[in-house]
Amino acid sequence: MENIYQFKIFSNFKDIIHFVSKRDISKPLENSLALHTGEKSSLILENRIDISKSIVGDMDFVLANQTHSSNIEIIRERRARGWRDKNSAVKNCDALITKVKGVMVGVLTADCVPILIFDPKLKIVGAIHAGWRGTKEKIALKTLKRMVEEFNSNPKDIVVGVAPSIRGCCYEVDFNVAQHFLEYKGLYKLLDNGKYIVDLPNINIRQLLSLGVERENIEDSNICTYCEFNNYFSYRKTACSGRFLSTIGIK
């Protein structure tokens, strides 16, 4: 479908469904899927129902009330949360893990780094929201550690998709943000104006590699939301209230 992005690395696994939604001017509110940003909820729900019916069918979505934390929640039952209304969303959480069939875990973003993960041996999926605060707290690495501790996942088995986000070409920050990432040589740059460019997607990738994920098991979309704001919501570029969804689930 033209209004979604999918990873090639997940395409060989027939027991999962995944997608990243895209901005679409033909849809209400340009296909925003966020209930929490103040837009008309009936139109957001219309978009959610449409994309759910056309792609996943009989699956239940679980979303979180994202707070730029490093909190991780394991979803242990099949029950929609945060999909039909925002009040039922998982509270104060930025990463979701499940092995329950029929559950789609997802994160909503408009520049932050969305990461989808899959353990094909143990049939476990996860969705991670990594802004600069979450990246500083190593939320992706902590999510994988939680899978190891809870389910005995082997990092070498884990397959990862890094969805569209603002990238090192465009993510300009002050020193108060950049100072947290100076250990990642080659993934930041000091500009002539005294600010820094920071490459959050590759910092998250480096964190996952440090725990033993194989590089060939990580697919980076290499799509910058700031550069491709016509296809993906970018808060930095347009100050939009729209958000796109990155989601994965076990059939």
What are these regions (language model features)?
Residues 1-251:
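Active-site microenvironment for binding and transforming phosphate-containing groups
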